Regions:
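Phosphate-binding/switch loop-helix module in NTP-utilizing enzymes
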Residues: 88-135
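Hydrophobic positions on the alpha1 helix immediately C-terminal to the Walker A/P-loop
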Residues: 27, 31
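Conserved catalytic-core segment of NTP-binding enzymes
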Residues: 118-119, 125-196
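Extreme N-terminal, non-catalytic leader segments
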Residues: 1-18
Length: 196
């Protein structure tokens, strides 16, 4: 594959999960905020075309401006942000086939004016479909962090996701076992979803 860097970025890190509802978008947002707190220039790209969450997570209601050729990311908390959710109405379903999704991803990676980013954090959609393949084959990603929960069914899907990224030669930077337990008022640890 001929992978191209995203112009205006030094490092591109994808946050991925094979299943929805595991905390991937929350982790991606918190990672972006943590990197910003370290005085780094950070961008956050919500690549979940069918279920964008960045507008809600960052309370962004405005539309991005354009310089005539490229979209300008919306700046929130000092982070450059872009999402399909900024370009559509909240209640509008995205009834798109693969080629339209790929076109949207290419717009976000080639036609957004990312400026002097140390890190671009990409919040991927759940699964192993067109979006993941497009990013892995066409974008120079520095690595992926995979988010899961301890349930057996989620872990089976994670294994598939790991195999996909391995085949596409994308470095796996880490695996987060999210929602693995909580500490109750009694000080005891409870693994409500089982042990992963």
């Amino acid at each position: 594959f001929r992978r191209n860097p995203i112009i205006g970025t030094k490092f591109t890190i994808a946050i991925s999960s094979a299943k929805g509802g595991v905390g991937k978008s929350t982790f991606a947002s918190n990672l972006a905020l943590a990197l910003k707190k370290m005085d780094l220039n950070v961008g956050l790209l919500d690549a979940d075309i069918y279920g964008p969450s960045l507008p809600k997570l960052f309370s962004i209601n405005e539309k991005p401006e354009s310089d005539g050729q490229k979209l300008k990311p919306i700046l929130k908390y000092g982070i450059q942000c872009m999402s399909i959710g900024f370009l559509t109405e909240e209640q509008t379903p995205m009834i798109w086939r693969g080629p339209m999704v790929i076109s949207a991803i290419k717009t976000f990676t080639q036609k957004v004016l990312w400026e002097n980013l140390d890190f671009l954090i990409v919040d991927m959609p759940p699964g192993t479909g067109d979006t993941q393949l497009t990013f892995a084959q066409e974008i120079n990603m520095d690595g992926v962090i995979i988010i899961s929960t301890p349930q057996e069914i989620a872990l089976q899907d994670v294994k598939r996701g790991i195999r996909m990224f391995d085949k596409l030669k994308v470095k796996i930077l880490g695996l987060i076992d999210n929602m693995s337990h909580f500490i109750g008022d009694d000080g005891k640890k409870y693994a409500i979803f089982g042990e992963g």
